[in-house]
Regions:
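Nucleic acid-binding interface residues in structured DNA/RNA-binding domains
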Residues: 1-101
């Protein structure tokens, strides 16, 4: 079964997030043309082969902070108490669009 256009758009945006950076579900949604919850659903169903740990809530929290922390440490992404330091590592929709070009 082929992936829907929405799934392809979301996964394409997630694929351009550089190592050492994160973004929020909302920022991915702005670029993919959908809602933040749609991004979460796509990643839940199709995100196992993506860098899912680079997509976090707006406050920097992960849906699975224990697993994400392993990846954050590998990529030197500063975090504490299950939250990424967004001001240090976060990128926004404008930056994501530039990376998509």
């Amino acid at each position: 079964m082929s992936e829907s256009p929405l799934v392809k758009r979301v996964l394409a945006v997630v694929a351009v997030i550089p190592p050492g950076n994160v973004t929020s579900y909302g920022e991915v949604a702005k670029v993919a043309g959908c809602g933040a919850r749609n991004v979460g659903t796509v990643l839940k169903r199709h995100g196992a082969s993506t860098a899912w740990w680079r997509v976090v809530r707006a406050d920097g929290a992960s849906h699975d902070p224990a697993r994400a922390a392993e990846f954050w440490d590998r990529e030197a992404i500063a975090h504490a108490n299950g939250r990424v330091k967004m001001h240090e590592h976060g990128i926004d929709a404008r930056e994501l669009r530039e990376l998509m070009e």
